[in-house]
UniProtKB/Swiss-Prot annotation:
InterPro entries cross-referenced by the UniProt entry: ATPase_NBD, Type_III_PanK
Gene: coaX
Gene3D superfamilies according to UniProt: 3.30.420.40
Residue numbers annotated as active site: D111 (proton acceptor)
Cofactor requirements of the protein: NH4(+); K(+)
Protein name: Type III pantothenate kinase
Ligand binding (ATP): D6, V7, R8, N9, T10, H11, T12, V13, S134
Taxonomy of the source species: Bacteria, Bacillati, Actinomycetota, Actinomycetes, Mycobacteriales
């Protein structure tokens, strides 16, 4: 059983994956709030409470964090609480198997890397990956499995909250799909702007990538969405063909397996 930990700016996803290779399957997934000042002890208490008896069946762990301070605590947690469980954390120097054809590879978020790796592995073609999180990342992987770059826009919830915070007449609203693109009250107007506006933003970016990037205009390009807020916008997206809620967890598994294979079938346990 592999423990997968995906730490983002606002929320953290913890998953359990059984099997490996083509037989791997996410059997459990939880979503908890990310606390930037969380300690290793607090993380261990939370995760151990989630996975329960499966803690005794762990054969490996793989994690990433877009919050550097939390990545350190994840490392300490694994070393202290599961010292005999081999682990891989996605950071510079770790083999991901995906070349980063960008100006500064160290700037590329680990989440973007593993998403593109998972999409390329699953579909075997060039791909455009749209991750709906606190930011919307639209990333591009070539038919050779190379990370070409991407575009980053503010996330749906972040943008809606910012509009409410900066405007005296607006308030924070629940993000649900409105009855119409034409709102009949302030709440519906904000919901329409968020849902239909971001659907248009994503479709526009995907279409522009198809038009501007060599090799992406044909039908042999997979367009994949993932992320917690993706289902809110999916019904109104015209360019996205696939939705995979476990894409990042699958990418974490692939990196773990790749590093395990590179060390002749066994990673060194934490010391």
């Amino acid at each position: 059983m592999l423990l997968a930990i995906d730490v983002r700016n606002t929320h953290t996803v913890v998953g359990l994956i059984s099997g490996s290779g083509d037989h791997a399957k996410v059997v459990q997934q939880w979503r908890i709030r990310t606390e930037p000042e969380v300690t290793a002890d607090e993380l261990a208490l939370t995760i151990d409470g989630l996975i329960g008896d499966d803690a005794e069946r762990l054969t490996g762990a793989s994690g990433l964090s877009t919050v550097p301070s939390v990545l350190h605590e994840v490392r300490v947690m694994l070393e202290q609480y599961w010292p005999n469980v081999p682990h891989v954390l996605i950071e510079p120097g770790v083999r991901t198997g995906i070349p980063l054809l960008v100006d500064n590879p160290k700037e590329v978020g680990a989440d973007r890397i593993v998403n593109c790796l998972a999409a390329y592995h699953k579909y075997g073609t060039a791909a455009i990956v749209v991750d709906f999180g606190s930011s919307i990342c639209v990333d591009v992987v070539s038919a050779k499995g190379e990370f070409l770059g991407g575009a980053i826009a503010p996330g749906v919830q972040v943008s809606s909250d910012a509009a409410a915070a900066r405007s005296a007449a607006l308030r924070r609203v629940e993000l649900t799909r409105p009855r119409s693109v034409i709102g009949k009250n302030t709440v519906e107007c904000m919901q329409a702007g968020a849902v239909f506006g971001f659907a248009g933003l994503v479709d526009g970016l995907v279409n522009r990538i198809r038009d501007d990037v060599d090799g992406f205009s044909g039908a042999d390009v997979a367009v994949v969405a993932t992320g917690h807020t993706a289902p809110l916008v999916l019904p109104d997206l015209r360019t996205v063909e696939h939705y995979d809620r476990h894409l990042t967890l699958d990418g974490l598994r692939l990196v773990f397996e790749r590093n395990r294979a590179n060390q002749r079938g066994k990673l060194k346990p934490a010391r």
